[in-house]
UniProtKB/Swiss-Prot annotation:
This is Bradykinin-potentiating peptide 12a. Its main location: secreted. GO terms for cellular component: extracellular region. The keyword Secreted applies. It comes from Bothrops atrox. It is found in: Secreted. The lineage of its organism: Eukaryota, Metazoa, Chordata, Craniata, Vertebrata. One of its GO terms (molecular function) is peptidase inhibitor activity. It comes from the Eukaryota.
């Protein structure tokens, strides 16, 4: 299993 990647930054 691949390590969960960081969530994408939420635009303003």
């Amino acid at each position: 299993q691949q390590w969960p990647r960081d969530p994408a930054p939420i635009p303003p």
